[in-house]
Amino acid sequence: MGKIKIGINGFGRIGRLVARVALQSEDVELVAVNDPFITTEYMTYMFKYDTVHGQWKHHEVKVKDSKTLIFGTKEVAVFGCRNPEEIPWAAAGAEYVVESTGVFTDKDKAAAHLKGGAKKVVISAPSKDAPMFVVGVNEKEYKSDVNIVSNASCTTNCLAPLAKVINDRFGIVEGLMTTVHAITATQKTVDGPSMKDWRGGRAASFNIIPSSTGAAKAVGKVLPALNGKLTGMAFRVPTVDVSVVDLTVRLEKPASYDQIKAAIKEEAEGKLKGILGYVEEDLVSTDFQGDSRSSIFDAKAGIALSDTFVKLVSWYDNEWGYSTRVIDLIRHMHSTN
């Protein structure tokens, strides 16, 4: 079987990291990138140097011309189309397109990529109408006739595997989630206008900012048994990467905290290995930087009030872990098609 050929639309935080994951994968080939706002020279610079994840050291990256980058010996086509319909994915050989602009997140808008010859589109954000898949939770429900999917959000990818284990083993009556979330590109360096979210317009590096998130409700889309049972909110905090979920739930079946830990550890070492992690060391956020797992349960940080009411804590590298799952989802789709 040949390599899985992918294209990336939008070379921002997630686009560049998906490219890094793809270029380190034996079975995936990056063939094209589209971004109308940056030149190939600037694209190369942004790819090579990353404040959070460090300098790219796997092979040389250079510009061949205004429409081609060279990664090692591999040429990658570069396009600058604003309209997704105009991107010649087929000409570049891209079968799967990662839609990572954050703009074309509904099915109709993402479908524009199919007109350029893409066969499948993976939206690297939640979508109001595209089916959402979380690897390790519901990806097996993907059917090969579905052409546009969402990889959900980084927070849903952290929360869903944990919620699945707890619900499968003990049953969740209801729960509330808080994510303590690193800064993202939509925030402001200094106080600035943000008409839809006034607090979100305040300086990111000086404030803890309460914010909304649909991540908990979205779990109900990937785990229908939990629909209407979870909701949550976020605090944006002044760190550049790695976030942490606090899930507080009421259980159907009474269980000690040790029993809950044992169940999570068993799944983390079994069916969910590589997706769900389990740690007992005294770790802090930077210890999870570059961790490719979706959700790393912190056994020491959680606490139980009673045998039916418990707080669970799970870490995630909201950039690297999520970008790794985008490629994993494409792999699964390819194996199904």
UniProtKB/Swiss-Prot annotation:
Entry-linked SMART domains: Gp_dh_N
Active site positions: 154 (nucleophile)
Catalytic activity: D-glyceraldehyde 3-phosphate + phosphate + NAD(+) = (2R)-3-phospho-glyceroyl phosphate + NADH + H(+)
Main location: cytoplasm
Residue numbers marked as site, Activates thiol group during catalysis: 181
Keywords noted in UniProt: Cytoplasm, Glycolysis, NAD, Oxidoreductase
GO biological process, one term: glycolytic process
Lineage: superkingdom: Eukaryota
Pathway per the UniProt entry: Carbohydrate degradation; glycolysis; pyruvate from D-glyceraldehyde 3-phosphate: step 1/5
Misc: Plants contain two types of GAPDH: cytosolic forms which participate in glycolysis and chloroplast forms which participate in photosynthesis. All the forms are encoded by distinct genes.
Protein name as catalogued: Glyceraldehyde-3-phosphate dehydrogenase 3, cytosolic
Organism: Oryza sativa subsp. japonica
